[in-house]
């Protein structure tokens, strides 16, 4: 197991991608801090981690609150002593055309997706630098690269999170601390279902696909540097733009 003896803090870990990441990292030997607002969900995930033979604590947190984020960090340090991995996975998406974006929806999206990433990173970054090891993975979105219609607040938050990830990585280089941005495409989650009417959910990425990807990144040798990486759903690939007809599928 490549993460034996390490501790990972995962936000948004009560369900979906965060839960899948928690279980995947536990299978590689990591102890897990399961963090999210939903107490019942994170307690259930913590039990799943323990069933895999790893230690886990469930910590309720609203990543918009500096005090709650610091309390999460304090709980992690008290239980495990050190934290080597942080996965910033909390996120929200309220999709509307620009004239219909409310100030409350804008603030919620920016506060969770961008401010939350900042606060959680800040809570662990100095600790990692002092220990001369650490890896921060920010699960962002492919919307960090393309601002599509009705994704104004969402894209703005994700573009910002990508830039912040790059800064985190640059500041961590001298201390052996890495930061990686993971940009998933369409994933079959509750958040996706709330905003999209997908006729075929089997065509979407599954949370486990993203979790496997994050685990791959976190288990590379120290010499490997992955600053940013995308993973997409096959059905969203753009159609070929050339006009050459292919015969017999070749």
Give short role names for the model-derived ranges.
Residues 141:
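Residue(s) in the substrate-gating loop at a strand-loop-helix junction
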Residues 121, 157:
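Active-site helix of classical SDR
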Residues 39-40, 60-72, 103:
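The beta1-alpha1 cofactor-binding region of Rossmann-like NAD(H)/NADP(H)-dependent oxidoreductases
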Residues 28-44:
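Conserved glycine-rich Rossmann-like NAD(P)H-binding loop of the short-chain dehydrogenase/reductase
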Residues 174-177, 181-182, 189, 197-239:
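C-terminal helical subdomain
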Residues 97-98, 105-110:
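Substrate-binding pocket helix/loop in short-chain dehydrogenase/reductase
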Residues 7, 14-16:
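Conserved glycine-rich cofactor-binding loop
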